[in-house]
């Protein structure tokens, strides 16, 4: 069971069978007390702001807190679990008691990946890890290979997206216990599904973050982020806390990878950037498993994604490609507000570039910011780019949380879904997308008092004067905003739901049979734009064994099919000499036939 335990510098750690060391960096305090169950035990200052105490006879499930000189009791910032919310007692967890899971499971190759992004709280009516287990066979049968779980680190309240986490090592209690999350991951592995966790290392949430009280030096007042003072990554105890969190989740929970949120907001002046250090430590510590590390970075840069002579990725594996989404969204909806203005002019050409090259912005000036954005990315193979037409951000950050199907209609959405799943980029589906879910995914929280008021007013202000949504923005703290965001599983049994599922399943079967084998070559691919016109795109990718081509039309008029060589892998609806409105055709030409 060795891989189920990870020794942290912070927190409650078993140092022998029945002795637990409690250790916390509290440089802002002169003394500290451990409240263990009913007993208050003085901790020892061991230098450089650290306090610790070794206590015999501590058992799994024992509750504890740290007590400040003024009597304030706070949770352990490195808590493995909470007895309740972020303000209450932490719980001692003996990770040695967890079963080892599937010892044979070593993960899946990245080229196989079809990502399914889900939010535990809204994925099922119950909103728990255990309830989500019941849906795993459905995902495996559909053709999903990787589940990407939105952040589960404990955050304020019971409802939230998870990006306001404050206890990085503790699964959110409203979703279940550590045992429940272990069970979810083990069940997924038993079905051949990888599990990746979205992790937030760029800020802490506004409720339940006691680090400024324990250690003001954890933050840098000179380094501002959208969420307040930045994290002082250069400080050694801070660096230990941040770098060990990813290793903890991968080791103790046997996860298959991590998605690193908004890394453009992680500013580190160290000689070695903290993200590089994290990736190197992960690769060194877990050499025998398929570990996939993806990044979200609005800068469109690739310095953390080098490739060796064999095409392997010694640091991070891939990057979310917002440019693909934004171009596809403008192409399908015609919306040009906010960041969509960068894709407003000739969106068909921008989407064609996203398909063939990856980034749309590779050094060009953004209309929104007036600054150059991005770098050339021709050195990266197609599987470097994680593409999507929907995700939690792009849906939930709309005032009304509308999904693409509600904005562009079912037919256009089907065409774009087919292009997504049959392109050589790595596709990501957002929960419910596979059966044509129309329920919104809204921004929801569970704050109270002045914080709730500030969030409510801030959300309304954000959309005031924007498409007339200001007055009607749902209150994030209203429980109905959360309830409305839950997946409607009843739709799966409807005729429309069944039609969508057949469509998605067909596409994923084709992907696994025809696209994945091309990606396993691991080579840089030549992408080519064959033709574009308003509402129409035709592109191709030349692989060593042949050429993959696709053409689609979302316009109101039929257009001639461009000259696409090879056998038809997929067409919807039937495509012969012309591309009807809202249609797509995908072809593959072997070897010499593709030249």
Model region roles, listed by residue range:
Residues 68-103, 191, 211-216, 220, ...:
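Core domains of carbohydrate- and sulfate-ester-processing enzymes
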Residues 20-27, 550-552:
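Short edge beta-strand/loop segments characteristic of extracellular beta-sandwich folds
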Residues 4, 8, 357-374, 429-430, ...:
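Glycan-recognition and catalytic regions of carbohydrate-active enzymes
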Residues 275, 279-467:
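Conserved alpha/beta catalytic core and glycan-binding cleft of carbohydrate-active enzymes
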Residues 26, 60-63, 575-595:
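C-terminal beta-strand-rich structural cap/linker in extracellular carbohydrate-active enzymes
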Residues 25-31, 555-557, 564-565:
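Short proline/glycine-enriched turn/loop motifs at strand-loop junctions of beta-rich domains
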Residues 83, 106-110, 119-292, 303-304, ...:
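Substrate-binding/active-site clefts of carbohydrate-active enzymes
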Residues 1-21, 40-117, 124-127, 138, ...:
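The feature marks proteins involved in alpha-glucan
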